[in-house]
Amino acid sequence: MKTIKSLFTSTKPELLVTGFVFTEGPLWHPDDILYVSDVDAQVHYKVRLEQKVITEVIRDGSGGANGAVFDKDGCLVICEQDARRVVRYEPDGSITVLVDKYGDKRLNRSNDIILHPDGSLYFTDPDKKGLEESDKELGFASIFRINLDGDLVLLAKDMNHPNGLGFSVDGKTLYVSNSRPDPHLHAYSVDNSGMLNDSRIVAEMPYGNLGELSGVPDGLKLDAEGNIYVTGPGGIWVWDKYEEFLGVIELPELPANIGWGGTDNCTMFVTARTSVYTFKMTRPGIPKQF
């Protein structure tokens, strides 16, 4: 029988770098770099992995940069939750706004983003927490897709606070964490056109059930075997490919998001409040972008 410990070479996290305010959006690049956003400080950084030091500020005044992914052309794409938009960092250093409105209404607070195998981008736009009443325009929380032609498609609006998201190994299921007010792991089937159907709750994730650490479901990733990892109350919650709960790996700080990296894609990077931690895994993560 598979255990949660069999997925980690060690369940003790290794501190990579610290000194931030609120870390998010870990994204690995093969040039020995980890991109990390400090959401509250409004700064986006490069961390040099071998030296375990911050080597460069790539954007100061980052719009609350949160989830990040490389697009089909290898450009960095960021959800800027405070600026309420999704942007792409161009090779020349300029920034292109991919989307900031659905129709004539501004997005809520774009949160996390992933790349579909066809090159389109799926992202969550959760509820309006943090917005003044007068700034609320959409009236619902959403999961969107940015098509290759730039069109924005509404995929789902039946969750209260969709947050992290990830595709199953076969691409036929999209898993999404719901943060509040009913924290849980959610799932949709993905049809051949990339639309979402068969909305269902996989598992409830109650608030702060692990001693002094609280928190909500947040970042989400899967590995090549189909195991599901969600940052949540007290640590990283794990389910196997059959959606059976395996347990929780605790961290010194409350985690917010997860990223895969390393040449074998077997390193898990975890952003957790003031720090970034790593685990070495026994299965590679998906997708492998490089």
Region roles according to the model:
Residues 43-45, 85-87, 141-144, 184-186, ...:
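A short loop-to-beta-strand structural motif that recurs across blades of beta-propeller domains
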Residues 39-40, 81-82, 128-140, 179-183, ...:
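Short, solvent-exposed loop/turn segments at conserved positions within beta-propeller repeat blades
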Residues 37, 79, 124, 177, ...:
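Residue-level marker for isolated small/hydroxyl-bearing positions within beta-strands
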Residues 1-11, 41, 137, 195-196, ...:
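Blade/loop signatures of beta-propeller domains
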Residues 55-60, 96-100, 154-157, 196-204, ...:
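Beta-propeller fold detector
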Residues 12, 17-33, 60-80, 85, ...:
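Beta-rich, blade/repeat-based domains predominating
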Residues 188-195, 281-288:
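Short loop/turn segments immediately following beta-strands, especially the blade-tip
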Residues 34-59:
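Beta-propeller domains
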